Regions:
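Loop/turn elements at helix/coil->beta-strand transitions in domains of secreted/extracellular proteins
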Residues: 55, 107-112, 166-169
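Mature N-terminal segment immediately following signal peptide/propeptide cleavage
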Residues: 44-62
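Extracytoplasmic/secreted envelope proteins and their assembly/folding machinery
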Residues: 72, 95-102, 124, 128, ...
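Catalytic cores and adjacent binding grooves of peptidoglycan-active enzymes
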Residues: 44, 49, 133-196
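Acidic helix-start/capping segments at beta-turn-to-alpha-helix junctions
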Residues: 110-126
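N-terminal secretory targeting signals
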Residues: 1-47, 194-196
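Charged, often glycine-rich, active-site loop that binds/positions anionic groups
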Residues: 122-136
């Protein structure tokens, strides 16, 4: 997993010849010095459409190294098991993974189609009985996986971007037109027949 180290903008202090020459008694505390715009942490933003519920979400869920609890709760609800209504507590790395995939593709802020988010054990069993390629111990049941596509981006490109990040598992489902990504161990697989 690649961790993004973010330093709160108020803790960053830039050294310029003028500040180096300033006596310590005249120095302005770093917290009182506004950070240049280029040093202010950019927000982590997700736009998603859930293909089963028809719901959309457009939300900033993180600023710098701070996750926004209300936004995270809304994402958890959005990614609930659409069969049972059960709301998970998603692994935050999944949200960051989606953001990193968009950045890698050069489409930050693009709307992501969600094919499958969280699954209860009941839903996972149901899918195993009716579809191909559903793992017995799927990371969807741990809220550590998501099946997606991005309109306008081929699923081959999407798969390649996810693989290049080396942040978890990547499943390629070309017939069903989606890519599975998770924050488990780094691995890859492909299912050439219809399935989830």
């Amino acid at each position: 997993m690649c961790l993004l180290l973010a330093v709160p903008f108020f803790a960053i202090r830039t050294a310029t010849p003028a500040t180096r020459a300033t006596p310590a008694s005249d120095a302005v505390p770093a917290a009182a010095t506004p950070a240049p715009a280029s040093l202010v942490p950019s927000p982590y933003h997700l736009r998603m459409f859930h293909t089963h519920t028809g719901e959309r979400i457009d939300i900033i869920y993180r600023r710098g190294d701070t996750y926004l609890p209300d936004a995270v709760a809304r994402l958890d609800d959005f990614l609930r098991d659409h069969r049972t209504g059960t709301v998970p507590q998603y692994d935050l790395r999944v949200f960051d993974l989606l953001t990193e995939i968009e950045r890698k593709l050069g489409v930050p802020g693009a709307e992501i189609d969600v094919i499958c988010g969280y699954r209860t054990p009941w839903s996972n069993t149901f899918l195993r009985e009716h579809s191909a390629g559903v793992a017995l111990h799927s990371l969807h049941m741990e809220a550590e996986a998501i099946d997606i596509r991005i309109p306008g981006v081929s699923i081959t490109r999407l798969r390649d971007a996810a693989l290049a990040l080396h942040l978890g598992g990547v499943g390629y489902y070309p017939v069903s037109q989606f890519v599975h990504v998770d924050v488990g161990r780094v691995r890859q697989w492909s299912l050439q027949s219809s399935g989830k």
